[in-house]
């Protein structure tokens, strides 16, 4: 079972949340993501994608290590999605020595730059704002080891996809994980251009 190989703290939190068994999607996706492979994880609504995203992200990070720069970037569609995901993460991170921060267009770049400079482990944000921070040297991604896209259905939008690709091209050794609710023709084409050597998990 995927949960058995998680950190004890994560298992304790799952137990506290009354989450005992992994969903079929989580059984397929969590081991693949933990292996370090680039993964397209396709699951229906309520399949447990968000929990899988959070667990694999926190499993990868060592909360006792000192890092000033972000190690995880998570792309979401808008401010609402960023804050919602951050809130779900904080159910877990309030028990850990890890910091996360959300960035989006509705807040000043300088404010975001200053907070990130103080030290953030996980940055959640819109593609447009993350690209702006990166291209203006307002975010140091030298320690980044994972780039996650919460919903691949957003990628076919030209501006969204271009912003992500622009960042990803600078970090070829990074792990890429893309979540989606479906795997259609657009996704097949996208996989060939964005993550050609990825593993696809579908449940």
What are the residue ranges of the model-derived segments?
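Walker A/P-loop NTP-binding motif
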Residues: 27-39, 48-67, 90
């Amino acid at each position: 079972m995927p949960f058995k190989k998680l950190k004890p703290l994560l298992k304790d939190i799952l137990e506290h949340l009354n989450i005992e068994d992994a969903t079929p999607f989580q059984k397929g996706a969590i081991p693949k993501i933990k292996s370090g492979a680039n993964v397209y994880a396709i699951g229906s609504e309520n399949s447990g994608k968000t929990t899988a995203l959070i667990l694999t992200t926190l499993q990868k990070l060592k909360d006792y290590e000192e890092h000033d720069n972000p190690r995880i970037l998570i792309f979401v569609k808008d401010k609402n999605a960023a804050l919602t995901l951050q809130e779900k993460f904080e159910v877990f991170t309030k028990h850990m020595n890890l910091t996360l921060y959300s960035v989006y267009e509705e807040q000043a770049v300088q404010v975001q730059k200053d907070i990130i400079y103080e030290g953030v482990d996980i940055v959640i944000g819109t593609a447009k704002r993350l690209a702006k921070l990166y291209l203006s040297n307002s975010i140091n991604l030298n320690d980044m080891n994972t780039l996650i896209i919460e919903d691949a259905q957003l990628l076919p939008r030209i501006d969204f996809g271009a912003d992500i690709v622009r960042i990803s091209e600078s970090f070829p050794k990074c792990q890429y994980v893309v979540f989606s609710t479906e795997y259609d023709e657009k996704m097949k084409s996208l996989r060939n251009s964005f993550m050609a050597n990825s593993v696809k998990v579908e449940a």
